Curated annotation (Swiss-Prot):
GO terms for biological process: aspartate metabolic process; D-amino acid catabolic process; grooming behavior; hormone metabolic process; insemination; nervous system process; regulation of cell communication. The gene is Ddo. Optimum temperature is 45 degrees Celsius. One of its GO terms (cellular component) is cytosol. InterPro entries: D-amino_acid_oxidase_CS, DAO, FAD-dep_OxRdtase. This is D-aspartate oxidase. FAD binds at residues 36-37, 43-44, 50, 307, 311-312. Belongs to the DAMOX/DASOX family.
Amino acid sequence: MDTVCIAVVGAGVIGLSTAACISQLVPGCTVTVISDRFTPDTTSNVAAGMLIPHTCADTPVPTQKRWFRETFEHLSEIAKSAEAADAGVHLVSGWQIFRSVPAEEVPFWADVVLGFRKMTEAELKRFPQYVFGQAFTTLKCETSAYLPWLERRIKGSGGLLLTRRIEDLWELQPSFDIVVNCSGLGSRRLVGDPMISPVRGQVLQARAPWVKHFIRDGGGLTYVYPGMSYVTLGGTRQKGDWNRSPDAELSREIFSRCCTLEPSLHRAYDIKEKVGLRPSRPGVRLQKEILVRGQQTLPVVHNYGHGSGGISVHWGSALEATRLVMECIHTLRTPASLSKL
């Protein structure tokens, strides 16, 4: 076998980062990203893009930490390069605050972010309803810039982007030797996974250029995340809700909650409503599988189900998916071991 043809299904941050990793690290292959929706119309485009991990119950914490560290290191390199503005990656400092002292005062990711420490009493005075807080510097990844940047990287490596709705992974055989499934919620239909479901997130994007520090309620529902062009105000976490239309009443509630944390937001302007459906699953599905139909076989690498935490671990999980793709290629080139895939 000479050139290996690889299809990546899905063009959110998981799909594009996986395609970019494969293009960068796997010699002798062609990569085609296939999706019915590309930026700016993906769920990832609604994401605030803050690197603060969301614990995934069925994914081992050491694995989550490794993915987060690899992602943080990857974006840190971009943030200190000439590419930072084009990629939409920058450092941001702020506070995560709690109404009661959390069971885990020092989270598993504390030594990955920069300058993690307990907030001082003077800092907490700014938030009178809160009794405990954490201060740190992390990274923000503006998906409106980062996704197009990843697309350019993929095309620059000879990859292709194809707008097409896939109804069945077998459609891609025999044109492609390996399929990487990064279809997020689409995996419910595409591979019949009943464990993946939507968690609806509604946010506001507002102009408030004077807001420089992030503020996040420890419960994760209310947050103020300043970015390069706008501040993201959140949010909601509505399990099983497929509605992509903004709810005006929810928007008012979100704005009110965020103004309680940062009263200067009352002066925010050019406010837009955004809705995304997070691909939630008890644990990320990152594994290889060989589909069999009659005498035909199709190697598949699954990489989906990151829920609210996709941005925070995208590069780490893309690296792991790439390692699995390499294993599939090795197997394809040694047919006698196909049954061991």
